[in-house]
UniProtKB/Swiss-Prot annotation:
PANTHER family the record matches: RIBOSOME-BINDING FACTOR A, CHLOROPLASTIC-RELATED
Gene designation: rbfA
Subunit structure of this chain's protein: Monomer. Binds 30S ribosomal subunits, but not 50S ribosomal subunits or 70S ribosomes.
Entry's Gene Ontology molecular function annotations: ribosomal small subunit binding
Keywords: Cytoplasm, Ribosome biogenesis
A UniProt-annotated Pfam family: RBFA
Disulfide bond residue pairs: none
InterPro entries: KH_dom-like_a/b, RbfA, RbfA_dom_sf, Ribosome-bd_factorA_CS
Main function: One of several proteins that assist in the late maturation steps of the functional core of the 30S ribosomal subunit. Associates with free 30S ribosomal subunits (but not with 30S subunits that are part of 70S ribosomes or polysomes). Required for efficient processing of 16S rRNA. May interact with the 5'-terminal helix region of 16S rRNA.
Record's keyword annotation contains Cytoplasm: yes
Compartment(s): Cytoplasm
Entry protein name: Ribosome-binding factor A
Gene Ontology BP terms: maturation of SSU-rRNA
Region entry Disordered, spans: 111-130
């Protein structure tokens, strides 16, 4: 039976995502930033850098949220170091995760397609066949 190997970076990434999620939640409240949640963390092989992907509850304020997180990244890293028992805590680089927005857009397009109904699509197909 093949076993799935877990690399240290995967384990550290999962732990950073859990701990940083809690830390960011508190920091957002304390610093008056728009609400965000940590959706994913990618850590470099040498554990020196972490790409932290966040999603904003208010998409129009996402740039403001990411900018605010970048400004307090040093404080967040210090709090993360206290929470984790690592010799070296990765440098945090915040990025907006637009996958939720893209998924919502696709969902809306599919709903619009359902609203059009099968009559419109069959007449389009008839026109293409001529």
């Amino acid at each position: 039976m093949p076993t799935k190997s877990f690399h240290r970076t995967d384990r550290v990434s999962a732990q950073v995502r859990r701990d940083l999620g809690t830390i960011v939640h508190a920091a957002v409240r304390d610093n008056g930033l728009p609400s965000v949640s940590v959706s994913d963390v990618e850590i470099s092989r040498d554990l020196a850098h972490a790409k932290v992907f966040v999603t904003a509850l208010q998409q129009e304020r996402s740039a403001e949220a990411v900018k605010g997180l970048k400004e307090i990244a040093g404080q967040l890293r210090t709090q993360l170091a206290r929470a984790m028992k690592l010799r070296h805590v990765p440098e945090l680089h915040f990025h907006y995760d637009d996958s939720v927005d893209r998924g919502e857009r696709i969902d809306n397009l599919l709903r619009d397609l359902d609203d059009v109904g099968p009559e419109a699509t069959s007449s389009d197909e008839d026109a293409e066949q001529r």
